[in-house]
Amino acid sequence: MANQKIRIRLKAYDYALIDRSAQEIVETAKRTGAVVKGPIPLPTKIERFNILRSPHVNKTSREQLEIRTHLRLMDIVDWTDKTTDALMKLDLSAGVDVEIKVQ
């Protein structure tokens, strides 16, 4: 479509899953003749939690946990209806959150 692009944002806790899914999207889009910009790795969001190890005493003894959220961004330019059909039929991993916007 003219002057429109599809922006795809991927979010996952495992970097291997997100890279594999991004590669599948790029291959599918290029197979239909679209131009793909990306995947661009965005900064990893790190959430840290401190939890008491003991339920009663020893407040100084704590467990430190963290969750890392990995993000990737892709733009698909010069896409056709074939591209959208192929992307809709694409089956990605369950651990990857996909957000698609047409701009």
Curated annotation (Swiss-Prot):
Xref: Gene3D superfamilies: Ribosomal protein S10 domain
Superkingdom assignment: Bacteria
InterPro entries: Ribosomal_uS10, Ribosomal_uS10_CS, Ribosomal_uS10_dom, Ribosomal_uS10_dom_sf
A biological-process GO annotation: translation
One Pfam family matching this protein: Ribosomal_S10
GO molecular function: structural constituent of ribosome; tRNA binding
GO cellular component terms given for this protein: ribonucleoprotein complex; ribosome
Keyword Cytoplasm recorded: no
The keyword Iron is assigned to this record: no
Record keywords, A-Z: Ribonucleoprotein, Ribosomal protein
Family: Belongs to the universal ribosomal protein uS10 family.
Function in brief: Involved in the binding of tRNA to the ribosomes.
NCBIfam families in the cross-refs: PRK00596.1, rpsJ_bact
Oligomer status and interactors: Part of the 30S ribosomal subunit.
PANTHER family: 30S RIBOSOMAL PROTEIN S10 FAMILY MEMBER
Name of the protein in its database record: Small ribosomal subunit protein uS10
